[in-house]
Each structure stands twice: as C-alpha cells, then as structure tokens.
C-alpha cells in the first residue's frame, strides 16, 4: 500500500495539493514504517475537532506520541523521516503521530471530496481485487491512471492548438478586413474625386439592374453598365436572344452616370462575394440591399457602402429568409427622349383622337400571356376590335403610344417588338 503514498523523496514532511492549495504533513519514523502528524492530517481532511477525530477514528495501536517514535540523541538510520532533534520539548514530544493504518482510517471516515474518491478506490477496486485474485497490483492502476492523464493532456494540447488556430484565423480575418476596408475607402475616394472633377459634365452613360421573373423570385440580378442609350437597348436583345417569354430579361433600375466603368468596377469589387460566378455579372442579393448599395456607390456614399460591406452576414440572412421585392419593369420609352440632343416628341399630335381611343380600348381589353405584350399580337387584337382604323405608316407611333398606355394600366407588362 505504500505505493499509494510515495515517501521516497520526502524527509521532514510530505506535501499534498488539495483544492488548489498545498498542505504539509510532518513525518516521523522511517520510509518502511512511517508516522504522520495527526493534527496536520485532520486539518487537511476537514476535521474540526482534532482530538475527537483521533480518538474516534484511530485505534490505540495506530497512534503514538512523537517522543516514543524519535530517538533523541541517537544516530538516525538512512531511511529516517522527520527532523533529528538534539532536544525534544515537552509539547513536541506529546504530539500524536499516526501510522499508515491510522492515516487510512481517518481518510475513510472523512467527508472531504478526495477522501470519498479514496474510499471508492479501496472498496470498489482494491478489496474486490484482493478477494478475487489474492492481491492487488498498484502498478496496473497507476499505469491506467497515467494513460488517462496522458490522454487528458493530449486532449488539452489539441484544444489549446485548436484555440490557437482559431485566434490566428480571427486575427488574420481582422487584418484582412482592415486591409480590405482601407482598399475600399481608397477606391471610393477615387470615385468621389472623379465624380467631383466631372460633375459639370453631363452624364450620358448608364448603370442598370435587370432580371427575369424567375430570377427576381430567386433574388438574382444582373448589374452592369453601358456607354450609350442604344447599347442599353441592345443589351436586352443580347440577354433575351433564344430565351422564352417567361425567361425574358427586363430592366428594373437605370441611372445615368459620367463614367459607368468606374462605378461598375467599384460594384464588382465590393459585391464580389455575392456574385453567382466570378466570370459573370449575376449577383445573388435581396433587391432592397442591392439597390441601396448601388445608389450609395452612384452617390459616392462611402460610409453606407462600408456599412453594407461590414454587414454581409445580415445581407445573406435577408436574402435567404425575406420575401423577394417585386419591381415592375422599366419601359425604355419613358427615358429615351431625355438623351442629350433628343427633343421630346408629342405623340398625341401624330395620331388622331379616334386612333388613340381605339388603342386605349384595345389596351383595356387586352390580356397578354405571361405579362408579355407582343407587337404583332397586339396589332391583331387592335384591328380585330377596331377594323376601321388605319395603321399604315403609323405602326411604330401606335406601338409607342400602346406601350405608354399599357405601362399605366399594368407596370408589370413587358413589351416585345
């Protein structure tokens, strides 16, 4: 049993750690026959009445006064424990020391947490082993305990390594965010400086957002820019080539700018994390965030742009959970006459009142499939309803008026020439 209490490196006392505090227990006797200071042991085990504890829980043969254990003035053997006194005072000599058996008796009777663990070890492991095998191998238990400690130490090391990695990742992400924020500030600053330098120049270029009915339900939008209005019109033709009516693209946002490339470059840089594919211009983002963000870039609002950039998690959450915002298509005829060099046309002076009234009646009764108004189908409907009107040489003007009237009736209608 002495393997449970290692006295090989002890001399005057042994030190144990309990509740994160070190306690010293004075020793006497030899390594083979050790004695422990009863008072010190009782204090460690939480006994309030030391004299009563020694009387109740330690047998007479397991306790001796120090004066009977010490050989005062004699030569101590090499394994002698405790101090060698030249003179032992009366009080020191009366101090009660207990044998190893007495020590275990006090432990077995104590309510201290580690004493309960010791009792379980003795009653559940050691004694059953002696009953079954006639002996108990402490080495096996110590080996198992050491393995458990090694596993615990390994787990703690792995946890520390993981925490270190997480700290490094957070630090790197913070450094990257600071660097990205600095770069964005510089980029927006250059855009602002450019806008300031060119504010007297009339904006003739365009930034647009377009989508389809299906894309709009999926929070998907194409964001880009063109140099002229004619290119803006042809852009839809490019997008819609080979597409069915239900997949036709339409504009939901158009703004003029002095230099669309600088705006487009800023948008691509700041919204790169929301692009469906890095090689195309399709973005996945809730429209409410997207339009505010594009407006912020167009207006040179660096603070809002950075706010959006720093709230990517919220943007992603809104994109996943919020219902899509449905925006009606923009009819290019509503803006085409405001280009530089163009004079507004008064279509009411081109067509007579009877033709305009017939077009309005046709619009009121027309129900286009999938909200797509095709020119030829509408003309057939118009002539079927009003066969007396003449459209020769006026088809384009009639179509323009029909689109203007149709946009008033249903902003969601799209038009195909």
UniProtKB/Swiss-Prot annotation:
Keyword Coiled coil: yes
Keyword Coiled coil listed: yes
Keywords: Coiled coil
InterPro entries named among the record's database cross-references: BRO_N_domain, Phage_T5_Orf172_DNA-bd
Sections of the chain in a coiled coil: 152-193
A Pfam match: Bro-N
Entries under PROSITE patterns matching the protein: BRO_N
Domain spans labelled Bro-N: 4-134
Similarity comment: family membership: Belongs to the IIV-6 201R/289L family.
PANTHER family reported for this sequence: BRO FAMILY PROTEIN, DNA-BINDING PROTEIN-RELATED-RELATED
Protein name (database record): Putative Bro-N domain-containing protein 289L
Gene source species: Invertebrate iridescent virus 6 (IIV-6)
């Amino acid at each position: 049993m002495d393997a449970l209490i290692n006295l090989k490196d002890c001399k005057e006392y042994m030190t144990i750690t309990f509740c994160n505090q070190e306690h010293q227990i004075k020793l006497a006797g030899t390594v083979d026959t050790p004695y422990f200071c009863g008072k010190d042991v009782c204090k460690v085990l939480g006994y309030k009445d030391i004299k009563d504890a020694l009387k109740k829980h330690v047998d007479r043969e397991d306790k001796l006064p120090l004066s009977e254990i010490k050989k005062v003035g004699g030569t101590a053997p090499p394994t002698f424990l405790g101090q060698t006194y030249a003179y032992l005072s009366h009080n020191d000599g009366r101090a009660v020391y207990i044998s190893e058996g007495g020590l275990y008796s006090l432990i077995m009777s104590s309510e201290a947490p580690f004493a309960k663990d010791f009792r379980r070890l003795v009653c559940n492991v050691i004694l059953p082993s002696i009953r079954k095998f006639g002996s108990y191998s402490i080495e096996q238990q110590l080996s198992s305990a050491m393995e458990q400690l090694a596993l615990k130490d390994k787990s703690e090391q792995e946890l520390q390594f993981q925490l270190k990695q997480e700290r490094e990742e957070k630090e790197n992400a913070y450094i990257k965010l600071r660097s990205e924020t600095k770069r964005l500030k510089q980029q927006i600053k250059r855009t602002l400086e450019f806008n300031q330098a060119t504010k007297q120049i009339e904006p003739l270029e365009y930034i647009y957002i377009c989508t389809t009915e299906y894309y709009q339900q999926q929070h998907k939008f194409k964001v880009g820019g063109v140099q002229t209005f004619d290119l803006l019109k042809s852009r839809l033709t490019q997008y819609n080539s080979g597409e069915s009516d239900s997949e036709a693209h339409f504009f939901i946002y158009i703004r003029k700018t002095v230099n669309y490339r600088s705006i487009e470059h800023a948008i691509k840089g700041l919204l790169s994390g929301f692009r469906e594919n890095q090689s195309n211009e399709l973005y996945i983002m809730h429209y409410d965030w997207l339009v505010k963000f594009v407006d912020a870039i167009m207006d040179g609002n660096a603070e809002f742009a950075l706010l959006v950039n720093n709230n990517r998690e919220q943007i992603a959450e809104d994109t996943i959970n919020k219902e899509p915002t449905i925006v009606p298509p923009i009819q290019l005829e509503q803006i085409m006459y405001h280009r530089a060099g163009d004079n507004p046309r008064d279509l009411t002076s081109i067509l007579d009142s009877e033709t305009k009234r017939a077009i309005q009646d046709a619009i009121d009764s027309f129900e286009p499939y999938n909200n797509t108004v095709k020119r030829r189908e509408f003309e057939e409907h118009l002539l079927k309803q009003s066969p007396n009107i003449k459209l020769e040489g006026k088809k384009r003007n009639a179509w323009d008026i029909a689109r203007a009237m149709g946009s008033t009736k249903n902003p969601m209608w799209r038009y195909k020439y």
